[in-house]
From Swiss-Prot:
Catalyzed chemical reaction(s): K(+)(out) + Na(+)(in) + ATP + H2O = K(+)(in) + Na(+)(out) + ADP + phosphate + H(+)
Chain positions covered by the region annotation Disordered: 1-36, 214-233
A molecular function GO annotation: metal ion binding
Compositional bias segments (type: Basic and acidic residues): 1-11, 26-36
Gene: ATP1A1
Protein known as: Sodium/potassium-transporting ATPase subunit alpha-1
Source species of the chain: Canis lupus familiaris
Swiss-Prot/TrEMBL keywords: Acetylation, ATP-binding, Cell membrane, Cell projection, Ion transport, Magnesium, Membrane, Metal-binding, Nucleotide-binding, Phosphoprotein, Potassium, Potassium transport, Sodium, Sodium transport, Sodium/potassium transport, Translocase, Transmembrane, Transmembrane helix, Transport
Extracellular compartment residues: 107-129, 307-318, 791-800, 865-916, 969-983
Bilayer topology annotation: Multi-pass membrane protein
Propeptide residue span(s): 1-5
GO cellular component: axon; basolateral plasma membrane; melanosome; membrane; plasma membrane; sarcolemma; sodium:potassium-exchanging ATPase complex
Amino acid sequence: MGKGVGRDKYEPAAVSEHGDKKKAKKERDMDELKKEVSMDDHKLSLDELHRKYGTDLSRGLTTARAAEILARDGPNALTPPPTTPEWVKFCRQLFGGFSMLLWIGAILCFLAYGIQAATEEEPQNDNLYLGVVLSAVVIITGCFSYYQEAKSSKIMESFKNMVPQQALVIRNGEKMSINAEEVVIGDLVEVKGGDRIPADLRIISANGCKVDNSSLTGESEPQTRSPDFTNENPLETRNIAFFSTNCVKGTARGIVVYTGDRTVMGRIATLASGLEGGQTPIAAEIEHFIHIITGVAVFLGVSFFILSLILEYTWLEAVIFLIGIIVANVPEGLLATVTVCLTLTAKRMARKNCLVKNLEAVETLGSTSTICSDKTGTLTQNRMTVAHMWFDNQIHEADTTENQSGVSFDKSSATWLALSRIAGLCNRAVFQANQENLPILKRAVAGDASESALLKCIELCCGSVKEMRDRYAKIVEIPFNSTNKYQLSIHKNPNTSEPRHLLVMKGAPERILDRCSSILLHGKEQPLDEELKDALQNAYLELGGLGERVLGFRHLFLPDEQFPEGFQFDTDDVNFPVENLCFVGFISMIGPPRAAVPDAVGKCRGAGIKVIMVTGDHPITAKAIAKGAGIISEGNETVEDIAARLNIPVRQVNPRDAKACVVHGSDLKDMTSEQLDGILKYHTEIVFARTSPQQKLIIVEGCQRQGAIVAVTGDGVNDSPALKKADIGVAMGIVGSDASKQAADMILLDDNFASIVTGVEEGRLIFDNLKKSIAYTLTSNIPEITPFLIFIIANIPLPLGTVTILCIDLGTDMVPAISLAYEQAESDIMKRQPRNPKTDKLVNERLISMAYGQIGMIQALGGFFTYFVILAENGFLPTHLLGLRVDWDDRWINDVEDSYGQQWTYEQRKIVEFTCHTAFFVSIVVVQWADLVICKTRRNSVFQQGMKNKILIFGLFEETALAAFLSYCPGMGVALRMYPLKPTWWFCAFPYSLLIFVYDEVRKLIIRRRPGGWVEKETYY
C-alpha cells in the first residue's frame, strides 16, 4: 500500500477476454494486500511532508485543490464488494449438492410418466406422484436451509458502520465540518476525544492524544499519539493515526496520507472480502457421497437397461426400468435428515454458548486439527488483575482466581498497609453506582485497566477504597502523562501522630526508582543503598519476565513547618518535593488466563489438536500467558530457554531441539513460506507475538499448507481476513467487532476458549452420528431396489411399489434416522486424533459394503420371504411366479391361473399384489428395528452403550405405529394402495431382524477382540 501502489490499482479492471487474466490479477492483488503495511510518511520531516502533499501546515489545502484531488482519487469510502444476490443464495440451496440428485430423480420420474402416458391407455400415476414428492422434498429442505443461513453474510456492512460521518478539516485557513467521504489526501484534519479518525493521518501536532487501536492491532491499552517518529514500523510509530480507530482523549492535528481503500483499514476490508472461503469439509464429504450413490445408481440402471433389452423387453419398458432403478437408489429422506441433524447440533451448541451461523461449520469444528487463538479476552480474562506485589524485600503472590480461591499473603504488614494506601489514593478509578450486591471482581469500573485492577485488589484486601479516599481527602493531583510516566497526588492525613500532608506517587519503575532516596522495610524507613537498589532492580526484572506490567509506588510525609494547614500547592509551577521520596513497593498486573483455559488446552492436546497463540502483545508477555494457559506446557523449552540454561548464544542451539517456539512478528516478516512451514512442522507449541493482521492470515495459510483444518479465533477488525480464510472462523460475541462476527462461521457468546473445546466435541460427535444415520438410511435401499431388479430378471409380479418406497424413505425411516443425532458418544471422542479428511470419509467403501452388501441383503431376504409367504397362501407358489409378470400386469386378461388352477381377475390379482407391497413395506420396518439398534454403535456392544436415547426409543414406536396406520387405516387402499395385513404376516421378518442383531454384535465383538484385524479393516466404517 506504499507509494508504489498507484491509484489505478484499485479501479475495477476492464472485463478481459480471458477469465484467467482476471484470476491472475486477483491473485496479484491479494498478494499485494498480504504484504506488510509499507509507508514512509511517518519518517518525513514537516518540511518534506509539505513538499510531498503541497499542504500549507497552518492553512491546509485550498478548496479548489481539494476538489481536484477528490475528482482524481474518488470519495474517501470503502468500495463495497460484489455481494451475492439473495435469489442466487436461494438457488444454491435448491440446486446444490444433494438437491441436484433429487432433482434429476424428479425429472426422470416426470419423463417416465410422460412416456407411459404417451404409450399406455390408462397409465399408472406412481411416477407422477414420485416426481411431485421428490420436488416437494427438495423445495422444503432448500427453504429450511436457506432460512438457517440467511441470518449470516455481508462482511462489508459492518465496515460501513465504521466510516465516520463528519470530519473537521482546515481549508483556506478556515475550519470547516465536511462529510467524511469528501476528505482528500493532503487535507489538514483536526480530531478530538470521542471522534473517529476519518482517514490515515500523519500527526503534526497533538495534545494528550490517545487512540484506541484495539480493533486494528489487538492492543487493549489506548495508544499515545504525538508528532514524534518512534518506530520504523508504521503500525507501531506514534505519529500515524489510522482510519476508523477512535480518538479516546486529547486533541490532534494531522495531514491525510491515505483515504478509502488505500487506508490500512481499507486494505483489511478488501482482504477480507476478497478471500475465498473454500468448501467446508462436510460439504466435500456430501459431494463425495453423492458421487458414490450416483455411481452405484447409474451402474445398476445401465446394467439392467442392457439386461432388459437382452431379455427382449421393448426399449420403452427398458427406459422405464432404468429410471425406476436410478430413482430407487436415491435416498429421498437423507437430505432432510442431514439438515435436521446439523440444526439440532447447532441448537445444542447454542445452549453451550457457541452460536453457529453456517450449519456445515458444526462438523468442521469437529475435524479441526489446529486452533490459532487470539490472546486477549479469549485465553485471558478480558481485564487486568493484580498478580504479584513486592514489599519487605520479597515477592508475594496475589490471588488472581475468578472466585478468590488461591493463595494469600500477610496482610498485617505495616509496609503492605502503606503500599495499599498509595494504590488506593493515587488512583482515579471508581466503581460504577448500584453494584453493592455484586462480587467485587464482577463490578464494572470507570477507569483504565491497570487502575481498575488496583482498585479491585485493594477493595478485596483492605475494605472500602471510597471510605479510605474520604478519610484522606485529595488536595491536588498531577495526572499521568507519557513524558513524566508517573501520577502524583497530595492528601490530607487524618492520623494526628504524623505530618498533615501525605504525598503519594505511582508510575513506571525506572522513573520511580530515580526519585527515591529511602525505602520502607517492615514499616521502618531505611536509606536506599546499592544492595537494596540491586534487589529492587532484580525484582522488577523478574516480574517483567513473567510478562507482567509492573508499577512502582512511593510516598512522602510533607513536613508541617514547610507545608502548614491551608498551604496552596501549585501543580503547574511545582512547589513541593518530587525527588528523595520513600520507596514502598511494586505491584504487577497481568491479564490472567480464564479459569477453564488450561484444562481446555489440555483437552485439545489430548484430542491431537495443536493450539497456536497469535497475539499483538510483547513476546515476554505472550510467552508468560502461553505458559499460564498451558499452550507452552511444563518442561518444554524455547530456543532462548535452552541457550540460557546452557549459557551459550542462541544461534548455537539447534532449533529442532526446542519443542516450544516464540516467533516475533518482525522475524515473521522476513521469513519465506518454507521457513514458516518448518516452524509449524517441527515445533509442537508455538506462540506468535507482535503480529499484524496480514501475518495472522499468512499463519493460517501456512497451517493449511500442512494439510491442517484450521479454526481461528478473533475479535478485532484486524482478524476478519484470517477468520474468513480459516476452515472455521470463531468470533467473540461480547467484545468482538461487527466485522469479525460477519466474517466468522461461529460466535462464542461468552468469549471463552473453553467453549471452542465443547464445540470440537459436538462436531466430532455429529460426524460419528451422521455416519450412523447414513448407514441406517442406506441399508433400506437394498430391500427397496432388489424387488425391482428381480421383477425385471425373473419376470415376477412387482413385490414392492414406488409409493411404498416413499412411505419408507420419507415416513417410517425419518424419525429413527434423526434420533441417531441424539446418540451419546461411544467412547471418549476427545482422546482420539482429528480425522484425516483425505482418508476418513463420512461415507466410505466399508460403510457401503456393510449397508448394501451385508445388512441390506439380510433385510431384502426378509422382505422376499414375506412376499412369497403371502402369494403362496393365496395359491401362487414361488416356482409358478417365474415369467408370470406379462399376463399378471395385463388388464385385459381376467383368467390367470394360480398353482391350484383357480382363475384370478385383473382386479383380484392387483389387490393381492398391493397387499404384498404393504407386507414387504412392513417387513422392511421390522428389519429396520434391528438396523436402528445396531447403528447406535460402531465398535461397542449395544449392551455397553445401553438404550438411554429416549428419542431413538420413540423412533422405534413411531415407525411401527406409522406402518400400522398405513396398513389398517380405512381408505388407504384407494389413497396409497395399501391393504390390511393378517397379524401373522408381521412376524415373517422377525427371524431376519434377530439375525441382523446377532450378526452385528458378533462382528463388533471380533473388532474389539482383534483391533486392526481383517474384520475391522473390512467392516469398521
